[in-house]
């Protein structure tokens, strides 16, 4: 995919997130993204036909630790699309953006299941107190 097509994918992705595509540099194949409050990162795109992977990084030391999930995802086996990588970055930055974690729903469902099992837990406590 040529760089302009990748930039179009990134621009479309931005329309559904708090991020803006603030700069593109075709010679470096670099795209810079920014969202309030000061969350920024950039993506280096591989050359067309090259076996290289995408690369994500941030020049902000506050943002950098949050990119670990996306960096691990990129380095895992298999070819990734720009959209998949941007989605991972968005998920990584949700806490910095003040958005709920995507996995919170799963956790709440798990807690709901645990609450249903409370009578069983009471029974175990009774068994312990009898000893």
Curated annotation (Swiss-Prot):
The gene name on file is mturn
Say which species the protein is native to: Xenopus laevis
Intracellular or extracellular location(s):
Cytoplasm
Induction of expression = Up-regulated by the proneural transcription factors Neurog2, Neurod1 and Ebf3.
Show the GO cellular component annotation of the record.
cytoplasm
Indicate what this protein is called per its UniProt record: Maturin
Pfam families found in the cross-reference section: DUF4581
Record's keyword annotation contains Cytoplasm: yes
| Outcome of gene disruption | Morpholino knockdown of the protein causes an accumulation of neuronal progenitor cells resulting in the neural plate expansion.
- Kindly report the protein's main subcellular placement as a broad class: cytoplasm
The annotated regions of Acidic residues compositional bias extend over 107-120
Q: Which UniProt keywords apply?
A: Cell cycle, Cytoplasm, Developmental protein, Differentiation, Growth arrest
Could you mention a single GO BP entry for this protein?
regulation of signaling
Which family does the record claim for this protein? Belongs to the MTURN family.
Task: Note the PANTHER family from the entry.
Answer: MATURIN (PTHR32008:SF2)
**InterPro entries from the xrefs?**
Maturin
**Functional description taken from the UniProt entry:** Involved in early neuronal development; required for cell cycle exit and differentiation of primary neurons. Cooperates synergistically with pak3 to promote primary neural differentiation within the neural plate. May play a role in promoting megakaryocyte differentiation.
Q: Where is this region: Disordered?
A: 107-131
